[in-house]
Amino acid sequence: MAEFKFTDLVEPVAVDKKTALRITVLGGGSFGTAMANLAARNGCDTMIWIRDAETAEEINKTHINKRYLPDFTLESSLRAVSDLEQAVCDRDIILVAIPSHSFRDVLKQIAPYITAQAVVSLTKGVEAKTFSFMSDIIREELPEVPYGVLSGPNLAKEIMAGMPSGTVIASDSELVRYAVQHALHSALFRVFGSDDVHGVELGGALKNIYAVAMGIGAAYKIGENTKSMILTRALAEMSRFAVKQGANPLTFLGLSGVGDLFATCNSPLSRNYQIGYALGSGKTLEQASKELGQTAEGINTIVQVRGKAQELDVYMPITNALYEVIFEGAPPLNIALSLMKNGHRSDVEFVLPHHEV
């Protein structure tokens, strides 16, 4: 029997070059490349900006991103460039897939060329020291532009393989939401809308913490009961923290919350899961990071969120235990102990507050 592929069910997209959206993705990592490829497949006039000119030239010649997605052929219409001005001038939407530590610097560089373009973050993380989320940085560096954030359970290799997936575009602007949906929505990739920018962004950033925890647990061969407890208590931590930040806790019931948390915590494809597994296998953070060869946002997020949680007095035992394991030399089993302490608490505290237990 021939192997079934979802892509076999999909009709080719009819392209109208006169009305095609002009999309640029900044960042040539796995997720940025996957989104650029989706936009190109949907008939958008699509560029991807990559710092290294040789890599950009290689992608244009081979239509393969050999470093991040070596097993997939990219759309022939997708153009890679290394010149920032060329990448962002006269475009409709700029999708920014830059690691959080470089996000602000890249926005500063493109600021002189931004006129009416919408800027949408694809980055899941927080800026070190400032505790700024990517939407905060967009507002600070490009105060006049319409903006949004894209987040969801989006493992790049699955998207490239044509497996049905979904994501969330969050923006205060209905026009931005519609434009991003138009650019990326397809028969195999569904794009939902939200106006809770901070909630969607928090879900995407915070879940990286718990993917590290699940990776460590996998190295210890934890059972299904324990995995379920990590997932649900992680969701409780995320919701508590989000409320303190002004987000709607109900947002965490959607794709950008529990959906992203489930996918990232259960997939060996996740960078944060991989680095957790390496740590649980006895490697140091330096060794694990070197082996991975890509940025794992969860490590920085653990540091930033732990500090903010202490400042805001938010109860986050898993996050605190992870910090102690990674940075203070505590045994990894401390994470399991963090799930079991502090006695009688309610399961869903927005339904039954702790003081009523």
UniProtKB/Swiss-Prot annotation:
Q: Identify which top EC class this enzyme belongs to.
A: oxidoreductase
- Cite the binding residues for sn-glycerol 3-phosphate: K124, G152, K207, D260, S270, R271, N272
Write out the GO biological process terms.
Answer: carbohydrate metabolic process; glycerol-3-phosphate biosynthetic process; glycerol-3-phosphate catabolic process; glycerophospholipid biosynthetic process
Q: Where does this polypeptide localize?
A: Cytoplasm
Known pathway: Membrane lipid metabolism; glycerophospholipid metabolism
Can the keyword Metal-binding be found in this entry's annotation? no
User: Which residues are responsible for catalysis?
Assistant: K207 (proton acceptor)
Main localization, broad class: cytoplasm
Q: Which UniProt keywords apply?
A: Cytoplasm, Lipid biosynthesis, Lipid metabolism, NAD, NADP, Nucleotide-binding, Oxidoreductase, Phospholipid biosynthesis, Phospholipid metabolism
The UniProt record gives the binding positions of NADPH as S30, F31, R51, K124, A156, R271, E297
EC numbers on record:
1.1.1.94
Q: Which reaction does it catalyse?
A: sn-glycerol 3-phosphate + NAD(+) = dihydroxyacetone phosphate + NADH + H(+); sn-glycerol 3-phosphate + NADP(+) = dihydroxyacetone phosphate + NADPH + H(+)
Give the Gene Ontology MF terms in alphabetical order: glycerol-3-phosphate dehydrogenase [NAD(P)+] activity; NAD binding
Instruction: State whether keyword Lipid biosynthesis applies.
Output: yes
User: Under the cellular component aspect of Gene Ontology, which terms does the record hold?
Assistant: cytosol
Into which family does the record put it?
Belongs to the NAD-dependent glycerol-3-phosphate dehydrogenase family.
- Give the function comment from the record: Catalyzes the reduction of the glycolytic intermediate dihydroxyacetone phosphate (DHAP) to sn-glycerol 3-phosphate (G3P), the key precursor for phospholipid synthesis.
Which PANTHER family is this protein grouped with?
A: GLYCEROL-3-PHOSPHATE DEHYDROGENASE (PTHR11728), GLYCEROL-3-PHOSPHATE DEHYDROGENASE [NAD(+)] 2, CHLOROPLASTIC (PTHR11728:SF1)
State the protein's name.
Glycerol-3-phosphate dehydrogenase [NAD(P)+]
Query: Which organism is this entry from?
Result: Acinetobacter baumannii (strain ATCC 17978 / DSM 105126 / CIP 53.77 / LMG 1025 / NCDC KC755 / 5377)
